[in-house]
Regions:
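N-terminal short beta-loop-beta anion/metal-coordinating cradle
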Residues: 30-33
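FMN-binding flavodoxin-like domain, especially the glycine-rich phosphate-binding loop
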Residues: 3-4, 9, 13, 17-28, ...
């Protein structure tokens, strides 16, 4: 199974999460703002920062470039200052393209996007990633 991990972050916490997800999956986590071309993939992990309940427009612009037949499944992880899940718009955009979404998104609460990931959250990220991998591997 081909797996890709991409993220959009202006802080440290989400980048840390993306790197952990990538490490577990055996791939490099790629910043959406870097020059790259996303190949077709079976499973895409997408990381996004949530600021004041909103996802940066750059994420939506990036996702608009996906041809609908290049990604089979996706899972979203995010960092939110208030701990709420604001990833619904991103999920809907991907489902509209015919991409199967993992039914639960991972939201990590962080009072600062520049803090360090706690051990509790680190374990949460690992468990989430392993659960998604099992679900998409059958």
């Amino acid at each position: 199974m081909k797996i890709s991990v991409i993220y959009f972050s202006k802080g440290k916490v989400l980048k840390q999460i993306a790197e952990i997800v990538g490490e577990i999956c055996g791939v490099e986590a790629i910043d959406m703002t870097s020059a790259h071309r996303l190949e077709s993939t079976d499973l895409l992990f997408i990381g996004i920062d949530e600021r004041k309940g909103k996802t940066d427009q750059a994420v939506f612009d990036y996702l608009d470039t996906f041809p609908s037949n290049t990604i089979l499944g996706a899972a979203i992880f995010s960092v939110s200052k208030d701990g709420k899940d604001y990833t619904g718009f991103v999920s809907n955009q991907l489902m509209h393209k015919g991409i199967t979404m993992f039914p639960k998104n991972l939201v990590v609460h962080s009072s600062s996007l520049f803090s360090k990931l706690s051990l509790k959250d680190l374990n949460k990220v690992k468990k989430y990633t392993e659960t998604v991998l099992k679900a998409f591997n059958g």
